[in-house]
Every structure is written in C-alpha cells, then in structure tokens.
C-alpha cells in the first residue's frame, strides 16, 4: 500500500504508543517529511521471534523499516537490528555474478576466483555432481542449508536431495542451534515445537531463564516480560547462567552455576517437588509415563577419540527403559543439596527459592531457554529435564504455564524443522528411517517405491568430517556461514572445504568466510528481493511478497535449486531398477519430475498478486511458491501439523498451526484449545501413541573437556545485541558496526589483574585446537565469574571457533559451543 505523509505519521504514532519500553523509532521525522513511500508487511530477517515489520520502498529500493503495529508478536516494536533492516541488502561488496576458481581458463581447486556466467557455473557444478553420483553414489553428494531458507526453498531442497539425488546428506545450520530442542520435544511429546505461545507471557507469574540472554537475543519478547514484571509486582524473574549478562538487570533472583551443572540443578528441583508433596498426582497418573534414559552415551567425537571408545552406550544414545514413579523418585533423590551445591557452586537457599516457584501449585511458570541448553553435550537431556518439572506439576499447555524453547533463526522452525531439512527427517515430523513415512512421501511426490534412502545422511558436524576424509565430494552450501560457525574450524571445517577431492559451492549475498573457502560462489537474492515464508518460535507461519529486485546477476536460492535440477536427466541419477518402476520418467529431467509434476505447477501466473513482483514465478511460468507450499502442506494436514491455505497467509500477520477450519491454535495438547484433543481427556499428548508425555530419569554427566593447569579457563561463546550470528549482514550496517565493531574477551577483573593484563590489552585465547587474537574487556555488559571467559562469534576477523571443541550431544548431534578449556596469553 502507499501511505500519505499524514497516514504514515499516524501509523508511526500508534507504533510509538505501543512501546512498553520507551523505544524510539529511528529516522521517523525524516521519513515523515519525505515523499510518500510504498509500505508492505514482512517478518524480520533476523531471529526466531518473528517480529512483523513495515517495509518502506522508494524508487525500487528499501529505504526504511519499522515495527508493524498490526503484528501480534511485537506490536509495533523492533529491536535495534530490526530498525536497520533496510540497510542489510546494500553492502558495498554485494555479490552480483557467479565466481569460479580458475587457472588457465578452466576450473582449478587452487585457482583464483573469476567471474563466469550462470550457465558456465551450472555446467561446471552439474559436471561435478554427475561425476560424483556416477563414481561414488548418492552418499558422496551433500548439501548444507539453513534456518534462514524460506519455507519453499527448504522444501525444494528436500525434494532435490532426498528424491532427486536420492541422498539424505542434507542438513541445516539449525543443527547448530535447535537440534537438541527437536530431540527434546520428540522424546517427551512425540511431536516437535512448543505447546504454548507468546500469549503465555501476559499470563505467567514467574519467568525462569535457563541459558538464555533474552535481553539481547530476543529483546522484543524481553520487553513483553519486562512489561509483565513492572505492571504486575508479584511477578518474578529468575535468570540462570554461567556468567552475568544484561538479563540479570531485571531478575529478582540470579543464579550463576558451574558449566554443565544445570543438569544437576534440574534434578534437584524434581527431587524437591517430590519430597515436598507437590506432584500433581492426577495429572501425572493420567497423562505421563516414566522412562530411564541410557547414560554414558559419549560426546559425538570421532570414533577413535578415547571418550568415544569408552562410552558404554555410544551406540545407543537414544535408548530408554520403562520405570515407575517410585523408581524415578529414587533416581532423583541422590540430587540433594550437598551434592548439587558441590557440583554447581549454587547455595541451597537459592536452589530452594527456585524450586519453590516450580512446586507451588498457585504459581504459573514459563521456562525459557535457548543456546545455553541446546548447545550442550547433554542438550537433549536438559530439554527433557525441564519438561519433567512442568509435567510433574501439571504446569503445561495452559495459559501462563509453558516450557518454551526459543528459536535462534527466522525459520529454524518453519523451514529447518517443519519442512524436514535435517538429514534424518521428512516434512511434518516424519523420518527417513520409518518405512511408512518414506512411502507417504514417495506417494505425495509421485516417486517409485524405494526412491528415498532409509538411512539418515551426514549431519552438520559429520559433513565437515566427511569432506575432510574425502567421502563427501560434491557439496552445496546455501544461506549459512559454516566455516565461521562450525566448531574446530582448523581441525575439520576448513581442511574439508579445501580438500582437493571436494567441489564446494556456496550461495550467498556477501563474500563470507565460507564463500571464500569455496570453489564456486553463486550470488543470491535475499529477504524481500523474493517472495517468502518463515515460521517462528510460536508456530506462526508468516508470508511476504517480493518488494524490490535483487541486484542484476543475483538469483534467489529457490531459483538456483529448481533451475539446477534441469541439468539432470532421471536416468543420470537413478538406478535402472528404480526407473523401471516409472518408465514414463525416462528422458525427463529432475525438474520435470520434482517441480512440474502436476502439483507444484498447478497454479497459474495469473494467481500471483499483480501489485508485486515475483521473479521466480515469472522465470518458471507458474506460481511456484504456491505450488510448493500446497504440496508441502499436504504432509501435515489431518496429522496435527495443519497449515492454512496459501492465500490466507498473505492476508494475515501469521497464523499458528495447527490451523483447522480457519482457526489457529494457541495451546496444543489441551482440551478446548487444541482441536486434536478428544473431549473428556483434558490433555492429550497425541504425538505419542498412548497420548502420554514421557518423564525421563537422566543423570548429571561431566563435559568432555574441563579446565586444568595448562588451560585454566572455561570458554563460552555467544552473541551480542547488535550483531546476528556471523555478522555477515549486521557488520555491513554502519550504525551496528560502530556500536560493536569487534569481538572482545570478556573476563573477570581479578583474573585480568592476576595475569597482569588490563582492559584493552591484546591477548591470545588459546585451546588445544587453535587460538585467536583479541582484546580484554573487564567492564562490559557481560560479567563472567572468575575462571570463565566469554567471546562473541560475530567477528570474522576473530574466528573464535578455531578454539572451540566439536563435541556434540550424541542424540541431537548438536555442537556444544558453551564450554571448553582455554588459556589466556598476553601478547
């Protein structure tokens, strides 16, 4: 829509009035005085909160963004990153042409990047993929995707890899951030994603943050918590962390614990609830079962690592056995005050204060967590154990009572998880190991039986290892910066990308660390340069239209995936016995079979909105986004993952699934709120066959690496307010760059004094794997206790993941970036 100055000023006033924290909208006066702009809705490009923004376009360029007053999530507010969204697409080094490593006029692994046409790029790329498939088979090709893919980009990638190339070697960077949340949900409830929603914030009495600095990482949700805390004096905020950060400013109770001991604290609270008679017996008896999870499961390291060799259940980390409530009670009884205080460093009075909040039946509790739980060698367990507390007390799936896993990326839920871009998954919580699930996917996709492989492919960490080992030879990376993001860069990621046996393609908008490590770089369109859809942390699916053109030469990731599929005849990638089951596919391309299958191409160009561009639909001659979405949605409709019809999302500010008969669901599993819960049951955890949630008995186990005399400090990595992930977008926004130009090493002043270093002094942060140079910060926003340092990872000039350990949770296969041993050396 086009707003007059008067209308825009009125809208701006409404947005300002909506602020609970006095946020000022940058540039409002200048914009109000300018000529009229064309404004449209879109979800924010950054975190998983899913804020709605109004995007102002003038002369074919995004010139302004501000909070959308009609968006339920943020109610007119945006954080500082959201306010500068208009600048993320206009960095001076934007990629606009494919770049191929060449020497003497042809591709060479040790060549220099040179511009090539899209046809040349795809010719070379297709040659490597075809040769690899012919010589080594589907397990030698792979793809690393993203929780920043749009829904249809992720879905197109799933089809290309798992159906077209018949390879499950597809994984998203959400493996680094949300995999433990997924396995936690699946083990406890049999279905992924939260049962509650953001509306719980306005109904809760207590907020408990477990390893989550919401003040900086989810600031808009933090403003809602702040509003609840300040407007309702009885509300309490508890923050647990391994170091002090900005969320401590609002906290009524703060707990700093020894890394990894959150597991022991969770069991202490469960023990407290049982000992003090606060178990909701009726709820537990009717709606839960108990299991003992396998322990001593290893740390996801290479098989020759001693910690893997000695792990008793490394081969079955997800295993469990049924137990009784009494056996569970006995199991957690060992987690008494003396034992847990010794492990965690937290005094009993603080443990009891926290435990009482969970135990009190009159107190509604929201538990929030993100990377502190998920990036954890026992992250799945941590997720299971916080659910234990809510299930024991019945504080779940009702307004204000919600265990809530926060999401780091804008569509880690909507794309990575729901679409099934993980190496073991298919859409709508289906998995490749289940023959019925494979059969259903093959039916929907019109594929011959046996097309989809039955074994999970290489996950994110394993992909780097297989690249290094020469077992993954044709590899495509889209919408992520994994050479900066992966742990143990020098040991695994970089040697893998530069292995002469590997041909690596990176699609990106800027020359990131990962792009520079590739053999072929493809320039991508981003955000509102294409039509898109994201799914946020509260199950809210949101659409946007293409609002501006991408730079000449750049193409969307969807276009790249689908156009590339035209290069492959079915007989070049499928075995003869498989093709014999569908002889009518002979001579057809993967494009014909996957994307012109009578379903994806059934919506004509005339169904696109004539007020907006749609480059992909124009390129392929049909409304490809709608076709992909509707085919994908057929997986979940009628199975508890119902999505609304495509056109509904362009009209709404997002809808929370399951959407049944046009109505979204705010609280799942609860009678009267969730249409899938049968009348008279109260609660029904229908992801599990028996309709019951699982309470797990799980122990404390130590991390794989702890400080010692040689490496006396814990290292934790993470983010800061001003930058997002690897900083490839935010560091190109001048205002955000100036606000926090470079990473620093936050450390305790007494540690700095003992070492003879002062604030601003250059030091090495060194582990057994590598080191970086950075500067000491003793007065900043983050205040580690003695013996721990914190270094953000946004700075490409300080690759802190040279230092980190590539240990993972053996169930979720997610990396632990929050704890390894380092030493600090004065330069």
Swiss-Prot record:
Binding annotation for Mo-bis(molybdopterin guanine dinucleotide): 81, 148, 173, 177, 241-245, 260-262, 371, 375, 481, 507-508, 530, 557, 717-726, 801, 818
Membrane spanning residue stretches: none
Endpoints of the signal sequence: 1-32
Single GO MF descriptor: nitrate reductase (cytochrome) activity
Main localisation: periplasm
EC code: 1.9.6.1
Cofactor needs: [4Fe-4S] cluster; Mo-bis(molybdopterin guanine dinucleotide)
Catalytic activity: 2 Fe(II)-[cytochrome] + nitrate + 2 H(+) = 2 Fe(III)-[cytochrome] + nitrite + H2O
Residues annotated to bind substrate: 793
Lineage: superkingdom: Bacteria
UniProt keyword Magnesium present: no
Domain (4Fe-4S Mo/W bis-MGD-type): residue spans on this chain: 37-93
Family statement drawn from the similarity comment of this UniProt entry: Belongs to the prokaryotic molybdopterin-containing oxidoreductase family. NasA/NapA/NarB subfamily.
Function in brief: Catalytic subunit of the periplasmic nitrate reductase complex NapAB. Receives electrons from NapB and catalyzes the reduction of nitrate to nitrite.
Name by which UniProt lists this protein: Periplasmic nitrate reductase
Organism: Paraburkholderia xenovorans (strain LB400)
């Amino acid at each position: 829509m086009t707003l007059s100055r008067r209308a825009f000023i009125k809208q701006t006033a409404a947005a300002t009035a909506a602020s609970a924290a006095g946020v000022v909208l940058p540039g409002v006066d200048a914009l109000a005085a300018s000529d009229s702009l064309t404004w449209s809705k879109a979800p924010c490009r950054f975190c998983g909160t899913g804020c709605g923004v109004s995007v102002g376009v003038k002369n074919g360029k995004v010139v302004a963004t501000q909070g959308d007053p009609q968006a339920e999530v943020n109610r007119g507010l945006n954080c500082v990153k959201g306010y500068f969204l208009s600048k993320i697409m206009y960095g001076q080094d934007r990629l606009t042409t494919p770049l191929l490593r060449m020497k003497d006029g042809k591709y060479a692994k040790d060549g220099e990047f040179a511009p090539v046409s899209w046809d040349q790029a795809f010719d070379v790329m297709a040659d490597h993929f075809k040769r690899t498939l012919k010589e080594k088979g589907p397990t030698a090709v792979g793809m690393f995707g993203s929780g920043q893919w749009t829904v249809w980009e992720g879905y197109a990638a799933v089809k290309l890899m798992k159906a077209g190339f018949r390879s499950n070697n597809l994984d998203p960077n959400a493996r680094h951030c949300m995999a433990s949340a997924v396995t936690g949900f699946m083990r406890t409830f049999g279905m992924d994603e939260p049962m509650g929603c953001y509306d719980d914030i306005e109904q809760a009495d207590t907020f408990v943050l477990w390893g989550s600095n919401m003040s900086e990482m989810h600031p808009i949700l933090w403003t809602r918590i702040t509003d609840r805390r300040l407007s309702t004096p009885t509300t309490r905020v508890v923050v647990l962390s391994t170091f002090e950060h900005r969320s401590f400013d609002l906290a009524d109770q703060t707990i700093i614990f020894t890394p990894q001991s959150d597991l022991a604290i969770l069991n202490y609270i469960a023990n407290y609830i049982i000992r003090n008679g606060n178990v909701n017996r009726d709820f537990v008896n009717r709606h839960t079962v108990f299991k003992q999870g396998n322990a001593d499961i290893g740390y996801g390291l290479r098989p020759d690592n001693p910690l893997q060799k000695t792990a008793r259940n490394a081969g079955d980390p997800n295993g469990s056995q049924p137990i009784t409530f009494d056996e569970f009670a006995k199991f957690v009884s060992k987690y008494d005050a003396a034992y847990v205080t010794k492990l965690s460093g937290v005094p009993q009075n603080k443990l009891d204060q926290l435990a009482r909040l969970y135990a009190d039946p009159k107190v509604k509790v929201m538990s929030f967590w993100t990377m502190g739980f998920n990036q954890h060698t026992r992250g799945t367990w941590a997720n299971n154990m916080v659910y234990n507390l809510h299930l024991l007390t019945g504080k779940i799936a009702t307004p204000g009572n919600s265990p809530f896993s926060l999401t780091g990326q804008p569509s880690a839920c909507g794309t990575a998880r729901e679409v099934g871009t993980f190496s073991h998954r298919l859409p709508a919580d289906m998995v490749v190991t289940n023959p019925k699930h494979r059969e259903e996917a093959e039916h929907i996709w019109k594929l011959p039986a046996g097309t989809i492989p039955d074994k999970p492919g290489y996950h994110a960490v394993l992909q780097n290892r297989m690249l290094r080992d020469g077992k993954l030879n044709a590899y495509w990376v889209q919408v992520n910066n994994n050479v900066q993001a992966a742990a143990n860069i020098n040991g695994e990621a970089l040697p893998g990308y530069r292995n002469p046996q590997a041909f690596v393609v990176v699609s990106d908008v800027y020359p990131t660390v990962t792009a520079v490590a590739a053999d072929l770089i493809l320039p991508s369109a981003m955000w509102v340069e294409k039509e898109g859809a994201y799914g946020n942390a509260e199950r809210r699916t949101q659409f946007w239209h293409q609002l501006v053109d991408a730079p000449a030469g750049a193409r969307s990731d969807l276009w790249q995936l689908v156009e590339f599929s035209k290069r492959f005849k079915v007989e070049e990638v499928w075995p003869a016995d498989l093709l014999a089951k569908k002889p009518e596919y002979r001579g057809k391309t993967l494009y014909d079979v996957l994307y012109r299958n009578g379903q994806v191409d059934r919506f004509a160009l005339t169904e696109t909105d004539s007020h907006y561009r749609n480059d992909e639909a124009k390129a392929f001659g049909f409304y490809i986004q709608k076709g992909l979405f509707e085919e994908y949605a057929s997986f979940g409709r009628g199975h508890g993952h119902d999505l609304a019809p495509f056109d509904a999302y362009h009209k709404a500010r997002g809808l929370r699934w399951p959407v049944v008969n046009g109505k979204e669901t705010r609280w799942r599993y609860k009678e009267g709120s969730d249409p899938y819960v049968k009348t008279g049951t109260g609660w029904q955890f229908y992801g599990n066959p028996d309709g019951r949630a699982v309470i797990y008995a799980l122990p404390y186990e130590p991390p794989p690496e702890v400080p010692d005399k040689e490496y006396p400090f814990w290292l934790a990595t993470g983010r800061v307010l001003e930058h997002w992930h690897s900083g490839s977008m935010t560091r190109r926004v001048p205002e955000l760059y100036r606000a926090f130009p470079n990473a620093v090493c936050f450390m305790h002043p007494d540690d700095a004094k003992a070492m003879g270093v002062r604030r601003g002094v250059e030091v090495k942060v060194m582990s057994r794997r590598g080191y970086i140079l950075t500067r000491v910060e003793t007065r900043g926003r983050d205040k580690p206790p003695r013996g721990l340092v914190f270094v953000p990872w946004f700075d490409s000039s300080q690759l802190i993941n040279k230092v980190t350990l590539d240990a993972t949770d053996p169930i979720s296969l997610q990396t632990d970036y929050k704890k390894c041993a380092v030493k600090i050396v004065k330069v």
